[in-house]
Amino acid sequence: MVFVRDRARREVCCHDERVSSGADLGGDGGDGGGAGRDGARAPERPSQWAARAELAERAVRARHLRRLWALPGTALGVPGWPASPAQRVFGPWNYWWQAHVLDCLVDAYIRSPDPRRRARVARFINGVRIRNGKDWLNDYYDDMAWLALALQRAEQYVGVRRPGAIQQLASALKDGWTEGGGGGIWWRLRDKYDENFKNVPANGPTAILFARLRDERAYETARWIEANLVDPQTGVVWDGLRVAEDGGIRQVETTTYTYCQGVYLGACLELATWGNDRQSRDWAERASRTVTAVATHLTVESEAAPSLVLRGQGGADGGLFAGILARYLARAALTLPEFGRTHEPAAFLATELVFASARAAWRNQAPAPRGPLFGPDWSQPAASPRTDTKAPERDLSVQAGAWMLLEAAALLARRK
């Protein structure tokens, strides 16, 4: 870890900002993250990162948020910009994208509370319920976990309550657990899809939710991931496993996604802050290990960005993956120091991963009407899309992922 930490100091902390978008939002040496006269890094400027997060918020609101079918008291995210005719009427239903936009709306309220943001959260929740058929359930367990988490945060931080929805979703997630493959919940409804896949994207956010609900199933779910889907050599979290007809494990899918690292990190942090001293230490150790694995195996370097920038995973669903990881890296940076000095290097590293990625995303934005437009790979320049292209920059997921990243940076800047 010392090597990675030194590399972070050497290559990330002293990199100057090169892009300006709005007053006092960064020019040469203007982001508060450049080198000072003695080569040390200047403190991050909370006001600047808050302003950048607000610009990302405004851009998503202006380009994507609309009333659902012109219904009063609703809002929802149009899945593409420029939007196709089907997208304009919310034909494609991207349930879990909307859950993450809701989470970002909650982030924005926490950053700068006001009645309009609160009302927007309430309208958005109404839009999700109506578009989903006046119900909360979905075929995919990971989708339901994300909506439950977003609703829970909306209640905790904004005061918009949907307790019946959270209970319904949590109950559905419990029903997804079986002993096949050693435990865990399925990726999607087994009866409908003849499912044989259990993965971290479903079990990770479920463990986070159960931990916040103080449900002991959180421990079982996270332990299942640790026992079956963490590389013992690198600490990287794998994707999932296939369950054989006899209930054994037929195959482990060892593909690595930023998404999986983020949700397992989040689960470890929740359990570390919940359990007794011994349990807390164990889960904090796993969280620190995951941060180190991310820095070592899931970052990129390019001419357009310094190292320690989180790896992009394309558009569509992949547009959210790195943003999810950034959310929980920010939590790691703030939480791990509570468990002693041995966790300070991992907390430092988590901070650097968030800020390096946020600087790169900001630097590589594309000019667009009504605010910055971000690409799916923050280490590369974004491109302005047209309606007749499949450019990932069109996707709401990609823009929400970058917004999530900038909210994480704004949170760290005001709390560190």
Give the positions of each predicted feature.
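Actinobacteria-biased recognition of intrinsically disordered, low-complexity terminal regions
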Residues: 1-41, 416
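CBM-like carbohydrate-recognition segments
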Residues: 13-14, 39-99, 111-146, 154-158, ...
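Alpha-helical positions within canonical tetratricopeptide repeat
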Residues: 116, 120, 161, 165, ...
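Asp-box/WD-like beta-propeller blade repeats and closely related beta-sheet repeat scaffolds
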Residues: 167-197
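Aromatic- and acid-rich polysaccharide-binding/catalytic face
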Residues: 204-205, 258-270, 291, 321-324, ...
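Active-site cradle of extracellular carbohydrate-active enzymes
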Residues: 206-210, 214-268
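Oxyanion-binding "anion nests"
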Residues: 263-275, 283-299
